[in-house]
Amino acid sequence: MNRRNAFKFLSILGLAPLAARVQASTPVVAPEIVDRKYWLRVLVKIADPLLESLSRGELRKNMPVECKPGMDADRRKVTYLEAFGRLMAGMAPWLELGADNSEEGQLRKKYIALAQKSMKMAVDLQSPDFMNFTEGGQPLVDAAFLAHAILRAPNVLWKQLDETTKQQIVVAMKSSRVITPGYSNWLLFSAMVEAFLLFAGEQHDELRMDLAIRKHMEWYKGDGMYGDGPDFHWDYYNSYVIQPMLVDILGELMKYSKKYEKTFETVVKRAQRYADIQERLISPEGTFPAIGRSLPYRFGAFQLLAQMALQHRLSDELNPAQVRSALSAVIQRMIEAPDVFDSNGWLRIGFSGHQPNIAESYISTGSLYLCSVGLLPLGLPASDPFWADALMDWTSRKIWSGQDFKADHAIND
């Protein structure tokens, strides 16, 4: 299906045009079904050029590589796995709902097929789009995001694959072990690869998982936040990487051993607190502080909040409907900024629009697809309270509109 027909199909489903922006001075008025359709429209717009190209073995041919001057040759070695692994990490829960006879179910059927074909292209040595899992440090990062995607969609991204592709994935993941992780959140990338191998019934290294868990427990700084290594960094890596991976690595280990049970309970409690903080960071206008590195990941900054909603682990302080409303405001504001996409639908570097100077040297086009993890709640069915409950103001809208509100408190653990 070409891009013109794809968007015609989306129009038939009622997924176009984009919903009206959330206005800070008025209540959120869009019906709940519009929110889901809007999120779906965003996901498809992000995913379409990437999966259409990769599924045909044309990703290298078609995907532009925007990066800092002088970094082109370096980033071309890694940007394609970045793009695919990160997109799948966010898209996986929606794909895992499977195909059905509904309009959305038929759309999922299309993208499940594209994702499965793309997976084959990514790990087949004979493919023109075979991806680099070994050269440089970056491939470990994105092998981990791809591994995380498989854990989030074990049926469509693993069980439904042919045995040859499964074995090629295992070989690719094991090959990433040649990369030594840094003494930082990178320990979790090695651990996530091993968690996938555990899931797949393959030889795995529990020590790599145990080390990552132990060090992050040591690096906890309090009130729901971990250091990135021994030091605290005021950025969004607690959400981009640390807490989503820590929760899910422990969740996978818990299927095989209860020895991590107490640690898991502690990590989830901390994640609930950090999700509370994330929701409070969203302003009445749908903005949030532009602090720290990797800002071009855009609303991927809210992966942890999105994951806690997906897993029904939000604290009692948060109603799922207010989380949906808050995230919708952020997504709309960021995705509708000018020049977010190029003329062929590929993401461009920026936080609010196209801002190439905001990128670090390690950022390239593929990096940007981490924004998709902000859309994780699409993995909840439309009947889930996250989608079905009436829209609700989020914390900052309530407080700044003058509503009385109880005090916020740190957790002491």
Where are these predicted regions, by residue range?
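An N-terminal, globular interaction/scaffold subdomain
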Residues: 83-89, 93-94, 99-108
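N-terminal export signals
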Residues: 5-25
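CBM-like carbohydrate-recognition segments
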Residues: 52-72, 123, 128, 330-413
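Low-complexity, Ser/Thr/Pro/Gly-enriched N-terminal "stalk/linker" regions
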Residues: 12, 26-82, 89, 93, ...
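Aromatic-lined, polymer-binding surfaces characteristic
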Residues: 80, 91-92, 108-268, 280-303
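Long, repeat-rich segments with strong aromatic
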Residues: 232-347, 359-382
